Amino acid sequence: SPLERMCNCGMSSEHLVGTSIPRFTFDTPTTPGNDFYALCAGTEPLCMIFLPGFDHPVTREYVTRYLKTLSALKGVRLACVVRSSARTVAQATQGAEFPFPIICDAPGVLYSYLGVEQARGLRSWSFAAQRIYKTAKEQGYRYDSSAPQILPLTLVVGHLGKILFIHSGRSQTDLPEDCTAIREIAREVASTLAAGPEGPRTRCSDETLTLPDLVGWDDVDNDR
């Protein structure tokens, strides 16, 4: 199953399961100041895919796949997080609306908070990544092959930002390949939760933060 394949790779951020992402506000390409906990509310869990910058070939490839397979997204919602500013994405897309949120985190605050990893050289490569880069190069994309590359992170979160599942990618393409895979992961997470005991008590705060406020959050005790 997609969940088993991801779990077998090892998860460096697995200790975060059962904790909560603090409340914060975020910008999308078209709307500033959105409430993260409002995004988490509802009857369906939220799958968050952390990607490199919006102009990165891997980001473009997977956002396109998710757009093309959106009809398969049942029982779960999707949000993609990118290391780009809302203005940059809005300019690149000419202000187009996306059918799922694009959370813009140019400074990488969420990436740091959740321990999103980077890798250099061949350690981050896969055959799929090579194909993506080859196509991008043919289309004029230039990149520094020696520069560290952001590895993807897949999260499933519930109410109040509670982390139900987390997977740190081992390569640049170690993430759900399309919306069908996202749906299957969410189903298996739900089945696991239904069968097992309750996880650790949710850590959350009533205070609404901005992304920069997340820095140093663990230095204080915010259990309520």
Where are the model-predicted features located?
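Cysteine/selenocysteine-centered motifs that mediate thiol-based redox chemistry or coordinate metal-sulfur cofactors
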Residues: T192-R224
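Short active-site neighborhood of thiol/selenol oxidoreductases, capturing the structured segment around
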Residues: F36-L67, R77
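Thiol/selenol-based redox catalytic cores and closely related redox-interacting motifs
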Residues: D105-D174
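Short beta-strand/turn micro-motifs composed of small residues
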Residues: L51, V82, G158
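Short loop/turn microsegments at loop-to-beta-strand junctions
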Residues: I21-P22, C47, L151-L153
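A short, polar/charged loop-to-alpha-helix boundary motif
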Residues: Q172-E188
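Structural microenvironment flanking redox-active thiols in thiol-disulfide oxidoreductases
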Residues: R60-Y113
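N-terminal "domain-start" segment that seeds a small globular fold
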Residues: C7-A41
